[in-house]
């Protein structure tokens, strides 16, 4: 996959600084283009990662009931404004045929999908589809809640407003009780 071109990012950041009337050569900004390029390489590292790769490790386990990893912290960049949004992902699935993956793999997949220019809706559905395609579970449910800086620091300026998205597949789509169980676990504070 294509690597991030840090040199090109540095040049672009210098141009942005000049375009807003700043001097990119002043002391406080001198290393800013390099810092931004390094940061972009990190926060967009998911562009070079397929979330499905995290589900290649499968354990044969006779468990066909709910598995839920909740409160997976993530951060991403809004593809419309290139400003951060951040929050928590909750990932649930019901294994089929003994195909269980490591719990950390669910968190790693969230991170891989989030670390790219993104929409929250796409994060949610991509995680769900990755699990469906690799583990073939009875059902998958992904709920993502996030605060978007594009709504906090510009435009409508509504700090604290959270956006919630969900992707529901398989048994969770058809069984209201199964859906309710996941939502109840998510809601519960320990």
UniProtKB/Swiss-Prot annotation:
InterPro entries according to UniProt: GTP-CH-I_C/QueF (IPR043133), GTP-CH-I_N (IPR043134), GTP_CycHdrlase_I (IPR001474), GTP_CycHdrlase_I_CS (IPR018234), GTP_CycHdrlase_I_dom (IPR020602)
Signal peptide: none
GO molecular function: GTP binding; GTP cyclohydrolase I activity; zinc ion binding
Entry binding sites for Zn(2+): 78, 81, 150
GO biological-process terms attached to the record: one-carbon metabolic process; tetrahydrobiopterin biosynthetic process; tetrahydrofolate biosynthetic process
Pathway assigned in UniProt: Cofactor biosynthesis; 7,8-dihydroneopterin triphosphate biosynthesis; 7,8-dihydroneopterin triphosphate from GTP: step 1/1
Catalytic activity, as annotated: GTP + H2O = 7,8-dihydroneopterin 3'-triphosphate + formate + H(+)
Keyword terms of this UniProt record: GTP-binding, Hydrolase, Metal-binding, Nucleotide-binding, One-carbon metabolism, Zinc
Regulation: K(+) ions moderately increases the Vmax, whereas UTP and Ca(2+) and Mg(2+) ions drastically increase the Km for GTP.
GO cellular component: cytoplasm
EC number(s) per entry: 3.5.4.16
Quaternary assembly: Toroid-shaped homodecamer, composed of two pentamers of five dimers.
Family membership noted in the UniProt record: Belongs to the GTP cyclohydrolase I family.
Protein's UniProt name: GTP cyclohydrolase 1
Lineage: Bacteria, Bacillati, Bacillota, Bacilli, Bacillales
